[in-house]
Every structure is written in C-alpha cells, then in structure tokens.
Amino acid sequence: MKTGKNYKFWFCTGSQDLYGDECLQKVAEHSKIIVEKLNESGNLPFEVVWKPTLITNELIRRTFNEANIDDECAGVIVWMHTFSPAKSWILGLQEYRKPLLHLHTQFNMEIPYDTIDMDFMNENQSAHGDREFGHMVTRMGIERKVVVGPWSDEKLQKKIGSWMRTAIGVVESSHIRVMRVADNMRNVAVTEGDKVEAQLKFGWEIDAYPVNEIAESVAAVSESDTNALVEEYYSKYNILLEGRDPAEFRKHVAVQAQIELGFERFLEEKNYQAIVTHFGDLGALKQLPGLAIQRLMEKGYGFGAEGDWKVAAMVRLMKIMTSGMKDAKGTSMLEDYTYNLVPGKEGILEAHMLEICPSIADGPISIKCQPLSMGDREDPARLVFTSKEGTGIATSLVDLGDRFRLLINTVDCKKVEKPMPKLPVATNFWTPQPDLITGAEAWILAGGAHHTAFTYDLTAEQMGDWAEAMGIEPVYIDNETTIRNLKKDLMLGNLVYRK
C-alpha cells in the first residue's frame, strides 16, 4: 500500500519594499540559491520549492492560503532575509493551517570586514528580522519548529530533513482511518480511549465492523490466489515443521494467506490504513490473524492487538513518517512481556502472541505453527525472528480522561544472551534509558501502556514535535531522566495541558 504522497515544502522569504528593487532582487537570488543547494544536498527527504519574496500583508496572506489548499504542500519554511515588519504576517499566520518551520540563518557566512557598509547591513539582517518574526509567532501562540545555523551546514540541513518527517506525520494524521473488527479486551483499561476526542485532536477516524463481515471477505479469496501466496511464503521464509506433518502444516499456513488477502482487500475497499483485532472475538475466522497481520504491517498498515486502536493509529503514523527512508530498520507494535533483572544484563523482552512486524527482524525469518491457548481456534501460523540491535523509541499514547499524553522512551535494543527455542514468537529485547529501574518507574508514573508503537527510525525529538503540533503533552524518558524531575514535569503537564 502507499505510505504517503510526494510532498513538497514551500520556502518563503520575508522582506519589505523599504530597501529598494536592487536589494529585493538580491534577496530573491539568495533565496533561490539556498533552495537549490538544499535540494542538492541529499539531506532532505522532500523537495523544497522557492516562492516569491513576501513583502506585503496580502501577498503573505494569499501565499499561506495557497499552501493550505495545495495537497502537495506539507509545510512552509520561513526565513527573514532582511527586516520584515511582523504585523504584516498576522493575517497570514492566523489563517495558516499546516506545519511551520522558522529557519534562522543568514546568506553570508562571514562579515566582510573590509567592504561592509549600510547597504550590506540592511540587506543581511536576519539577526534582526527573524527576531521580529519570532516574537509575533510566539505572541500568537503558534506551534512551530525553529532551526538555527548556517544554511549550508550539514547538521542544519539534517534538522530540516528530520522536521520534514514530523510535518508529514502532522499532515497525514488526519488521513488515518482505523478499522476495528473487535472491541477492547474485556476489563482492560489502558487500551480504552475517547475516539471522538482522538478525531478532534489527531483527525483519526476509528470505525467498528462486525468481525464476520471481514471474515466473508476472507472466505471469498480463491484457492488459486491463496496457493500463490503460500508459494511466496515458502520461497521467502524458513519453514520450521518441528515434527508436524508437512501437508497439515501447509494447510495452517494457507489459512493465514487467505486472511492476509481477505483483510487487505477489505481494507482497500473500505479505505482503511490500520486495523485492530482481538483473540476473544474471532467470529468465523479459523485462526487468530498472525502471519497475515505481520505481513500487512510490513506493507505499511497499522495494527493494534486486543482492540488497541491508539497503537494501530500510531504504528500507521510512524510507517508514514519513515516511508522512503534509506536504510530504515523498521517499525512495529510491541508489548512489554517479561524482565531480565540480572544486574548488568537488565532488560525487557518484547513480544506478542503473534503480531510483530518483520520489518524489525534481524537474520532469518521462519514460519511456525504452534498452539495458542487463547482464542479457541486452530494453531495459527506466525513469523518468528529476533530483532535488530540499536537505539529506538517506544511510544505510548494514553487517554488520561481529560486529555491525551504521549510517552516517548528512548531504548537500547540488544541481543539476548541465549536462544529461546521453546518460545514460538518474534521478539525484541531492550533496556529502556536511562536504565531499567528508572525507566520502568518513570513509565509507570506517567501512565504508560503495556503496548507500544516502536521504531528504530524516528527520534524522540521528532515524535515530541509531533505531539506538540497536535496540542498534546509529550513526556520524554531518556538518559537525562531522573524521577525527581519527571514528577515535576508531570505536575507541570497537568497544569498546562488539562482542559
């Protein structure tokens, strides 16, 4: 499935007509050079588009409204080359509805000591103009990203590129539709949530369908289509019979192939990009969707188990934000399962009954069929693997009753000490920063869930920027975290974000 459009970002330079035509011509030339070099740098995942210099109220207002209605525009980058009176920007900023990045830079790298005169000073006064603009945006209470430094610097360019992915998340959030083919697991609290408020805040549409309606789509898949997908499975993955009859094993795998095709066709037909299931509500399905869901996640669909629509939407969001990323390491739903508490080897074994995305796999991926005590169905086929090493983030969007909070924990993924031959599920193993004891205490104090949307490919800053853009509280747990300061942050968050 598609995980995003070919978005573009507009580059809008601010100035005024006080300095004359020659100055404005240089402003436009310099802006074009910056845009050209940014696009050539290879550090930005999306194209930057130059726009004529903004010097009047009406031009600013018209440009921002054109950005609002342009489906390909995911955000605007603004920079004040000269001084630009900020009252000129008020109407445009009031009506603007997309992500905004304020680039605080300067065309020239160095002061030309021998030749500098007042013409140069008037032409190159970003230090002046950007402060004026920044004051107005702050006074208006508009959420934006500020990036500061030489425009030719690789670090600055990568910061812009990083923000672009956050901006895509903000824009695409309102296009996420989650299909619930099961309600929440009975008596579970943290997977509940206000779906109306989620649509108001994030733009998510969360709808329920009877499980047997999607089961009809599964039953309608032809035998030939099913067999063709099974052949793909057998050519792509290791087959671990573990003493089972090969023909019987293949039948179990075929059930998952039929579910994958039926689910995907139903999701495409109804225009949904994420799905939730629950082992307690399987209707006419012969197996709990396992391998099928894993494959759908790998294609870009979001997923949440036991009715967890918040995780499903967040996984989909992260899939969009990381789409097209070079050397991406993967994104998946995960669940905190069990601890290793041995000193110096502390960590959390992450898994689920079946449904972990193979995009995070490291090494061989195998198909197993094993009994599942929950669901009262056939032994489901699933993909089994271990996950990559490296730093990632585990996020948990929780409903606190009067508002949402996004927990963002930076985690260090590792290999387990020994194989786990009797564990028939995909796994990840990580140590939360700053350490297991502090990280777990902080997570519990902040109200985090046991399900997470995890990725190797985004940073805590990116997801925190997304949360702030959506008007919700981000809570960071990382190497800088202390419980004393976290408690203060949570108390402040309760004051600032409470309705």
Regions flagged by a language model, labelled:
Residues G300-V425:
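C-terminal catalytic subdomain
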Residues D376-K499:
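Extended hydrophobic packing segments that form well-structured cores
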Residues C73-F83, L101-L103, Y272-T277:
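Periplasmic-binding protein-like
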Residues E231-E232, K236-G324:
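Long, internal scaffold/assembly segments composed of regular secondary structure
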Residues I60-C73, I90-G92, E260-E269:
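Short, well-structured alpha-helical segments in soluble
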Residues P45, H104, M109-R244:
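Cap/lid and interdomain-hinge subdomains that line or gate substrate/regulatory clefts
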Residues Q25-S41:
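Short catalytic helix/loop segments, enriched in acidic residues and glycine
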Residues T3-K26, H175-N184:
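Short beta-strand segments enriched in small/hydrophobic residues
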